[in-house]
């Protein structure tokens, strides 16, 4: 089977198979990097670690209004990047790291950002930043430790979702944004929840897509297996990259991101091609993500519990009732079942909507028509 056929059922299906919503497009984005916690201050993590300096790579689309009231902060999922929308020009693309180039020229939610789209840069100042701990330009295991001059690697301190939210809040300070609409999916939805609980005065509206209030035993089990695939790779144990482990980790994760309905519809006539698809996704993942960032961020996900130190999940979610909130589940999501998202929405006094799709957890990235319709009824 051709690579394009496999890719068309991969992460960028919406980009490859759906026509553009508008003949217009946004200008080629220019990624920027900001030092948000300089060396004179440093960054102390929730679990007691320390980073001498924290930088975040980010992109913006549109212009902040004079009243500074049109910002939208979008948080990406586990292996996403700051590149939310648009297409890099050749000069920008050549300036990127090999991992960023492997991620691709097109933004990961491109079909929702642009003229006439739900996140129109003519109306909104859209901000998207690569999470702390990732490998796409923000401070992470690949970054140089200022004290040693060498990459942190396996010495990078463990993070929590609250650490990720705190770094994103400092980015808003850097950009002069006091308050924003906050949107996140999957891991990004967890960060959005924590951001709203930590900084409620900074959230105009909250949108949580395909994310739970607590990372429970089912989701943690998938992360555990993916990490074990990496940690048990003989090459990783020798201190080298983990090619076999990373490919297997991705395959395990893809099974949690998809659903039986989608696999049957796509591969039912030739079941062996489903295996080829997983192998392809694993090989592709090797080129575009780093094992240490995968370990750091997946462990951060496993710390996610909005109720920790707040009297339990339900009591914590009650604090969100003053914020207009929308929770979006997916009817075939195996990773974070719809009932889990619906339950969180009820406790938060939030609206609840559900994406109908055979594609499982990844539907929030694929079913952009439904996502746009849902957001259109909620955003101002």
Curated annotation (Swiss-Prot):
Location of this chain's protein in the cell: Cytoplasm
Root EC class: transferase
Reactions it catalyzes: L-homoserine + acetyl-CoA = O-acetyl-L-homoserine + CoA
SUPFAM superfamilies in the record: alpha/beta-Hydrolases
Knockout consequences: Methionine auxotroph.
Principal location class: cytoplasm
Any matching Pfam family: Abhydrolase_1
Annotated GO CC locations: cytoplasm
Pathway field: Amino-acid biosynthesis; L-methionine biosynthesis via de novo pathway; O-acetyl-L-homoserine from L-homoserine: step 1/1
Binding site for substrate: 250, 362
Single Gene Ontology BP annotation: methionine biosynthetic process
Keywords: Acyltransferase, Amino-acid biosynthesis, Cytoplasm, Methionine biosynthesis, Transferase
Record-linked InterPro entries: AB_hydrolase_1, AB_hydrolase_fold, HAT_MetX-like
Domain (AB hydrolase-1): residue spans on this chain: 70-366
Keyword Cytoplasm: yes
Keyword Oxidoreductase recorded: no
Source organism superkingdom: Bacteria
GO MF entry, a single one: homoserine O-acetyltransferase activity
EC number: 2.3.1.31
Catalytic-site annotation from UniProt: 186 (nucleophile), 333, 361
Subunit and interaction comment: Homodimer.
NCBIfam families named in the record: homoserO_Ac_trn, PRK00175.1
Similarity comment: Belongs to the AB hydrolase superfamily. MetX family.
Function, in words: Transfers an acetyl group from acetyl-CoA to L-homoserine, forming acetyl-L-homoserine.
Stated name of the protein: Homoserine O-acetyltransferase
